[in-house]
């Protein structure tokens, strides 16, 4: 019966994969793939632990005591589903379940193994005792003892024992104790009068020393972490973890910083079938350097609200706040990689979607600005608008008689978070701004698109037409007076209309082809493709300078935006006029055997049939006519070119350029070289240049093509020095500012046994005049935990191709050491 069932199951798999619409007893195939369905023919038979079959094997055997006692000799073994016993001689009593093993006795149970001179074990009661055991448990812990008692299936007690998480012979650390108890179900080991040895030297003693035997959650003190930064000094943290329930836990972390004082941090995580989230925060009652309280709070929440009228409703919330703009810069060790954030998001969103064509959301979004208020390059008008609230409804239907139809309507109330406390503290205390520096208002937007994609082998063509309609209701705060001569809040045109409307048709035609031919590259056969693309766009001109600008900015010109409808992104406050065509050409060289791309060349450029007339300006009225005239002289966009080459399987290079054809000067340049010769080995070189964009707002009306933009070079890598030591580093240098913007240097150690250690130094710019330094030191001991602050997120985000030298732990199987 077993063979027949196994054969039937093996035959079932290819049959179902061959016929996608076939209905079977085991599953139902549909357009979404095969999904399993319950069947009464298949039943899971539970194993009775008290009535298990016993198998024996040996070279010779003898039966005594009315066939109830079996004596096995020569490679003897007794097997049950939950335990295996081996030895040179085994006596097995079938009535009592007692097994006595002599000579190289071994017990293998649930992936753990115990070897001793002799052992007694009851296969029914799961109890026993072993003399001079040497053991290895499933989680990787090893040790030895004078005597061991198997109290039950989850409890092992040992006398005069040694325990270590290092499985190699030369153990870095171990615990020595007159009595060690290991509780597998509680993930806990307890050593009475235990002494911790490192490199054979006793470093810590405790009358009740606890340790975890598996990498699972357990209530207790975690190992302390340490940090060193230039702004906070030496930091010390001692976390306490409280495992409230399998789906709830709390971590409390008292901390001390030598330049700041004491801080208390906490984190609460929760998980339920319909919702989950995390709440964390810190509080410092009095910063000894600034003499004021410092705090932070972060909350994320996701929740399923259920189904109504065929729609699934959900709720998301994100809230982040800090006591001041310098919090993350001062406490970068608390929130690594957040020191350069400029805005903290505070939002709550009610969303819905379902099996029909409609989806939407209602959200409220606010911000906390972390700009350096003393930096002249961060004026108050760089603060973002808040959306309080925003309501959006979207409908999508594809392949509707060959047509793709989408429509979206959004209503947003914009409020600028500029209040008197900002201006009088950071701008000019002599000015009275009436609490407003920018206009507030409501924007109504509707955009419906209809396209008819025609896709055939080797070519496609997609005509599309859309209608955009928007209406603005704006409060320019004309009721306020400005006694100190402050200019009025005005639009780009200098007007202050309360209501503005705009309706624009948008038409485009996107088409492309793909040609292939056989060729060679680097002396090997390749398939070369030639992929021309033409994108025509027409949008009539509408005067828009009297419309406020809430969330719209100029997009970066690249291969993605070259084929887009609007050169402005973020919102719909400006829609460019267009009578233009974008021409693009891509050629690829593909490996014939694997399809891997060995080389690719891309070029693209826009050509304007009519000169652009819509521009993005500021709120203050400025004369941008001269800038506009110079810009309007251009009949084509910048020329885009990019080439990527896989010189070998481990060496890749990429070069990109953006040429301003108006004056034949580079607007942007990018070049990179990346080499990954083997595991834990990488090297990357990068050069970036970006010229300053056109100056179309501000009081200094200069139109310059000087090479004074951003110009940076970066080198990063990970390199093995020996089989145990690895160097990591990165250096970013600004050629324009003539200074380092980031430096990282570190050394990693991994002994392939139980120890991983890292020391990393990082220095990075937090503004044009300020930098921060930090030192990360971490030591990880298998089975004991980690000491120090974790720099892995810094290394992963900063070094392309970085690999953790510590092999990730895999889930252990009970058959890990099956014999």
Task: Name each region found by the language model.
Residues 2-19:
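Gram-negative bacterial Sec-dependent N-terminal signal peptides
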Residues 7, 20-21, 233, 245:
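Immediate N-terminus of the mature polypeptide
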Residues 7, 25-26, 808:
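N-terminal compositionally biased, intrinsically disordered segments and leader/signal-like regions
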Residues 10-11, 58-60, 509:
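Short, Lys/Arg-rich amphipathic segments at extreme N-termini
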Residues 18, 63, 816-819:
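Short, intrinsically disordered, low-complexity terminal/loop segments
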Residues 21-160, 174-182, 187-193, 252, ...:
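N-terminal amphipathic/hydrophobic interface segments
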Residues 115-127, 135-157, 161-163, 168-176, ...:
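Outer-membrane beta-barrel proteins and related beta-barrel translocases across Gram-negative bacteria
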